[in-house]
Every structure is written in structure tokens, then in C-alpha cells.
């Protein structure tokens, strides 16, 4: 039910170049293709939403709400996002364990305790969804 595209697994503001146009702004460049593969483009929401959740939860909500309003989402969107958030959480957790001996904010935090808020984040949008059955 999705159009395969390039999924970066690290799509976030810091890896994009945005250009002003007459119609507003558009992404004109992307960096960091090291983990890129073909897949479901929705997978790239997880890294940016996760970053916003850590830095500014209100911005995460605004980003997610705007995405849902602007893009017709397919049935199963919430469940897929939970899996994508789990996968991204595993990647981030593994990186920090290997390179710093734990998460910068708290090296004693267990994975489940740290990852659960990210994995469950999309639950709040279950009743606000605009479904596209196509």
C-alpha cells in the first residue's frame, strides 16, 4: 500500500538543505545516505519525531498533526510508526551504548524505560486520523 522510495533512516532537519521559493520552502538537498535503503517513506518520520520529543515535545505534536493533516495516511499508520520508532530507538540506543557507554542524559536508564515513550508516542493520534483506504 505504499510507494517505495529512498528511506534515509536519518532524515532530520540537520541533514537537509531547505531553499526558499516563491511558494514557500522546499527541501533542495539531503545529506547522510549511509543507512539509506528502499522502503516505506513513513519510516523517515521516526528520527525527526524522536528528536522533537527529546528537545521540544510541543513541536513533535505540531509536526505530527501537520503531517496527518497534509498527507492522507493509510490504515495501519499508527502500528507502522510504533515499529519504526522501535527500530530507530534500537539504533540510537546501540550507538550510545557503543560510543559512550550509555545515553548522554542518563547512562543507567534501561532500554524499555527510555524507548517506551517514543514507541507509544503515536497512540495519541489514533482518534484524530484521516484515513485513506486506498
Q: For the regions a protein language model found, what residue spans apply to each?
A:
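A structural signal for well-ordered alpha-helical scaffolds and beta->alpha junctions
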Residues: 4, 56-64, 74, 108-115
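Active-site activation/catalytic loop segments of kinase-like enzymes and analogous catalytic loops
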Residues: 42-73, 85-103
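Active-site acidic catalytic loop and adjacent metal/ATP-binding pocket
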Residues: 1-43
Amino acid at each position: 500500500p505504499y510507494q517505495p522510495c529512498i528511506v534515509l533512516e536519518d532524515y532530520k532537519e540537520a541533514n537537509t538543505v531547505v531553499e526558499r521559493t516563491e511558494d514557500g520552502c522546499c527541501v533542495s538537498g539531503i545529506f547522510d545516505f549511509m543507512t539509506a535503503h528502499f522502503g516505506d517513506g513513513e519510516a523517515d518520520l521516526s528520527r525527526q519525531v524522536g528528536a522533537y520529543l527529546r528537545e521540544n515535545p510541543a513541536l513533535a505534536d505540531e509536526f505530527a498533526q501537520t503531517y496527518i493533516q497534509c498527507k492522507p495516511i493509510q490504515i495501519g499508520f499508527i502500528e507502522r510508526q510504533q515499529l519504526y520508532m522501535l527500530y530507530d530507538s534500537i539504533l540510537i540506543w546501540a550507538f550510545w551504548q557503543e560510543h559512550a557507554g550509555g545515553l548522554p542524559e542518563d547512562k543507567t536508564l534501561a532500554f524499555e524505560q527510555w524507548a517506551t515513550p517514543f514507541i507509544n508516542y503515536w497512540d495519541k493520534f489514533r482518534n484524530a486520523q484521516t484515513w485513506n483506504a486506498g
